[in-house]
Amino acid sequence: MKQKAIYPGTFDPFTNGHLDVLERALNIFEEVIVVIAENCQKHALFTIEEREAMTREVTCDYPGVTVEVLHRGLLADYARQVGARAIVRGVRQVKDFEYEFQMSLLNRQLYPEVTTVFLMPNVKYTYVASSIIKEVAMLGGDVSKFVHPCVLEMMHQKREEQN
Protein backbone atom coordinates (compact mmCIF):
# COMPACT_ATOMS: atom_id res chain seq x y z
CA MET A 1 0.00 0.00 0.00
CA LYS A 2 1.35 3.41 -0.96
CA GLN A 3 2.02 5.77 1.90
CA LYS A 4 0.25 9.05 1.18
CA ALA A 5 0.59 12.38 2.97
CA ILE A 6 -0.77 15.85 2.50
CA TYR A 7 1.33 18.98 2.85
CA PRO A 8 -1.05 21.89 3.40
CA GLY A 9 -0.34 25.60 3.41
CA THR A 10 -1.29 28.91 1.89
CA PHE A 11 2.02 28.98 -0.01
CA ASP A 12 1.83 32.73 -0.67
CA PRO A 13 4.38 32.40 -2.22
CA PHE A 14 5.85 28.88 -2.38
CA THR A 15 9.41 29.32 -1.06
CA ASN A 16 12.57 27.24 -1.15
CA GLY A 17 11.84 26.48 2.52
CA HIS A 18 8.53 24.91 1.48
CA LEU A 19 10.36 22.96 -1.23
CA ASP A 20 12.93 21.73 1.29
CA VAL A 21 10.18 20.38 3.55
CA LEU A 22 8.48 18.76 0.55
CA GLU A 23 11.73 17.04 -0.46
CA ARG A 24 12.12 15.72 3.08
CA ALA A 25 8.54 14.45 3.02
CA LEU A 26 9.25 12.61 -0.24
CA ASN A 27 12.01 10.72 1.57
CA ILE A 28 9.31 9.32 3.87
CA PHE A 29 6.16 9.09 1.74
CA GLU A 30 5.63 7.71 -1.75
CA GLU A 31 2.97 10.29 -2.53
CA VAL A 32 2.60 13.84 -1.23
CA ILE A 33 -0.33 16.05 -2.12
CA VAL A 34 0.54 19.72 -1.75
CA VAL A 35 -2.74 21.26 -0.61
CA ILE A 36 -3.10 24.97 -1.23
CA ALA A 37 -5.60 26.30 1.26
CA GLU A 38 -7.45 29.55 1.41
CA ASN A 39 -6.96 31.33 4.72
CA CYS A 40 -9.30 34.23 5.34
CA GLN A 41 -7.12 35.35 8.26
CA LYS A 42 -4.19 36.09 5.96
CA HIS A 43 -3.98 38.79 3.29
CA ALA A 44 -2.78 36.96 0.19
CA LEU A 45 -0.57 38.66 -2.38
CA PHE A 46 -1.36 35.99 -4.97
CA THR A 47 -4.74 34.60 -5.90
CA ILE A 48 -5.33 30.95 -5.16
CA GLU A 49 -5.08 30.25 -8.90
CA GLU A 50 -1.69 31.98 -9.07
CA ARG A 51 -0.48 30.04 -6.03
CA GLU A 52 -1.64 26.81 -7.62
CA ALA A 53 0.16 27.65 -10.89
CA MET A 54 3.43 28.58 -9.15
CA THR A 55 3.35 25.49 -6.96
CA ARG A 56 2.69 23.23 -9.95
CA GLU A 57 5.61 24.84 -11.80
CA VAL A 58 8.01 24.48 -8.86
CA THR A 59 7.06 20.85 -8.17
CA CYS A 60 6.53 19.56 -11.73
CA ASP A 61 9.75 17.51 -11.77
CA TYR A 62 9.03 15.69 -8.50
CA PRO A 63 7.54 12.22 -8.99
CA GLY A 64 4.89 11.45 -6.42
CA VAL A 65 3.82 15.07 -5.97
CA THR A 66 0.41 16.40 -6.91
CA VAL A 67 -1.01 19.84 -6.24
CA GLU A 68 -4.60 20.42 -5.17
CA VAL A 69 -6.63 23.37 -3.92
CA LEU A 70 -8.83 23.22 -0.84
CA HIS A 71 -11.33 26.04 -1.18
CA ARG A 72 -13.26 25.25 1.97
CA GLY A 73 -13.69 22.59 4.58
CA LEU A 74 -11.62 20.94 7.23
CA LEU A 75 -8.16 19.64 6.50
CA ALA A 76 -8.87 16.46 8.48
CA ASP A 77 -11.90 15.77 6.29
CA TYR A 78 -9.82 16.34 3.16
CA ALA A 79 -7.11 13.98 4.44
CA ARG A 80 -9.72 11.29 5.06
CA GLN A 81 -11.30 11.89 1.64
CA VAL A 82 -8.01 11.36 -0.24
CA GLY A 83 -6.84 8.50 1.98
CA ALA A 84 -3.88 10.33 3.47
CA ARG A 85 -2.63 8.99 6.78
CA ALA A 86 -0.24 11.85 7.49
CA ILE A 87 -0.23 15.63 7.48
CA VAL A 88 3.22 17.12 6.89
CA ARG A 89 4.04 20.40 8.58
CA GLY A 90 7.26 22.36 8.43
CA VAL A 91 8.46 23.69 11.76
CA ARG A 92 11.13 26.39 11.76
CA GLN A 93 11.01 27.54 15.37
CA VAL A 94 9.27 27.03 18.71
CA LYS A 95 6.49 29.47 17.80
CA ASP A 96 5.61 27.33 14.77
CA PHE A 97 5.60 24.19 16.89
CA GLU A 98 3.21 25.58 19.50
CA TYR A 99 0.57 26.38 16.88
CA GLU A 100 1.13 23.21 14.86
CA PHE A 101 0.99 21.03 17.98
CA GLN A 102 -2.47 22.37 18.82
CA MET A 103 -3.64 21.84 15.24
CA SER A 104 -2.29 18.28 15.21
CA LEU A 105 -4.24 17.42 18.35
CA LEU A 106 -7.42 18.86 16.86
CA ASN A 107 -6.90 17.02 13.56
CA ARG A 108 -6.39 13.77 15.48
CA GLN A 109 -9.71 14.29 17.24
CA LEU A 110 -11.43 14.85 13.90
CA TYR A 111 -9.62 12.02 12.07
CA PRO A 112 -8.02 9.60 14.58
CA GLU A 113 -6.14 7.68 11.88
CA VAL A 114 -4.12 10.73 10.81
CA THR A 115 -0.67 11.52 12.16
CA THR A 116 0.98 14.91 11.90
CA VAL A 117 4.63 14.69 10.90
CA PHE A 118 6.74 17.70 11.84
CA LEU A 119 9.73 18.27 9.60
CA MET A 120 12.44 20.82 10.16
CA PRO A 121 13.85 22.51 7.07
CA ASN A 122 17.53 22.98 6.40
CA VAL A 123 18.94 25.55 8.82
CA LYS A 124 19.43 28.03 5.97
CA TYR A 125 15.63 28.26 5.67
CA THR A 126 14.73 28.63 9.35
CA TYR A 127 14.16 32.36 8.98
CA VAL A 128 12.47 32.16 5.58
CA ALA A 129 8.77 32.95 5.91
CA SER A 130 6.44 33.78 3.04
CA SER A 131 5.36 36.99 4.79
CA ILE A 132 8.95 38.22 5.03
CA ILE A 133 9.74 37.22 1.45
CA LYS A 134 6.67 39.11 0.20
CA GLU A 135 7.60 42.23 2.14
CA VAL A 136 11.21 42.26 0.97
CA ALA A 137 10.22 41.60 -2.66
CA MET A 138 7.51 44.27 -2.69
CA LEU A 139 10.05 46.78 -1.39
CA GLY A 140 12.44 45.90 -4.22
CA GLY A 141 14.79 43.59 -2.34
CA ASP A 142 16.49 40.56 -3.85
CA VAL A 143 14.73 37.35 -2.81
CA SER A 144 16.20 35.16 -5.57
CA LYS A 145 17.95 32.90 -3.01
CA PHE A 146 14.64 32.09 -1.36
CA VAL A 147 12.26 31.29 -4.23
CA HIS A 148 12.18 29.39 -7.51
CA PRO A 149 12.80 31.54 -10.63
CA CYS A 150 9.15 31.27 -11.73
CA VAL A 151 8.02 32.55 -8.32
CA LEU A 152 10.55 35.38 -8.52
CA GLU A 153 9.13 36.41 -11.89
CA MET A 154 5.59 36.36 -10.53
CA MET A 155 6.70 38.51 -7.59
CA HIS A 156 8.32 41.02 -9.96
CA GLN A 157 5.05 41.20 -11.91
CA LYS A 158 3.07 41.82 -8.71
CA ARG A 159 5.47 44.58 -7.70
CA GLU A 160 5.08 46.26 -11.10
CA GLU A 161 1.28 46.03 -10.82
CA GLN A 162 1.37 47.73 -7.43
CA ASN A 163 3.66 50.58 -8.55
UniProtKB/Swiss-Prot annotation:
Pfam families on file: CTP_transf_like
Cellular compartment(s): Cytoplasm
Cofactor: Mg(2+)
EC category name: transferase
Main location: cytoplasm
Superkingdom of the organism of origin: Bacteria
GO cellular component, one term: cytoplasm
Pathways per UniProt: Cofactor biosynthesis; coenzyme A biosynthesis; CoA from (R)-pantothenate: step 4/5
Any Gene Ontology biological process: coenzyme A biosynthetic process
GO molecular function (one): ATP binding
Residues given in the record as ATP binding sites: T10, F11, H18, G90, V91, R92, E100, Y125, T126, Y127, V128, A129, S130, S131
Catalysed conversion reaction: (R)-4'-phosphopantetheine + ATP + H(+) = 3'-dephospho-CoA + diphosphate
Residues at the site labelled Transition state stabilizer: H18
EC number: 2.7.7.3
NCBIfam families, per database record: coaD_prev_kdtB, cyt_tran_rel
Function description: Reversibly transfers an adenylyl group from ATP to 4'-phosphopantetheine, yielding dephospho-CoA (dPCoA) and pyrophosphate.
Subunit: Homohexamer.
Protein name as annotated: Phosphopantetheine adenylyltransferase
Organism ancestry: Bacteria, Pseudomonadati, Chlorobiota, Chlorobiia, Chlorobiales
